[in-house]
Amino acid sequence: MGEIAPVEGTPMDFRTPHTVGERINDYSFRQLEIGKGYDHCYVLNKREAGSLSYAAKCVEPISGRFLEMWTTEPGVQLYTANWLSGFEGYKGATFPERSAICFEAQHFPDTPNKGHFPSCVLTPGNEYKQVTIYKFGVEK
């Protein structure tokens, strides 16, 4: 933990659009095997700390529905519900593993112990402020 690794040439690379399921079972990439799928923090290419930046987009190809995410946080955790198997939800609905996807705006894991990460320490008298926008729509 604490390494900011490049995504190029790995199943973690979503810089060009492709389906989440296309590479999720590429267990030659050890991190996908350990997490049973995606459960990783992505470092955003931000222009300036605290600025609102484009973070992620997810599109359902048949209907064209999309979710776009913008945030002031330095990272986004991508989680593909790898451990949901048999989870019971509203009105008895059951959810198998990988039946959902989450985009979570956040600081990097283990930030307080990594001096080279943006600080998340909140000292007395200071405020924590962040903005995350989830935009929903339909592409034609």
Where are the predicted features?
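An exposed, glycine/acidic-rich loop-and-rim segment of catalytic or binding clefts
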Residues: M1-K140
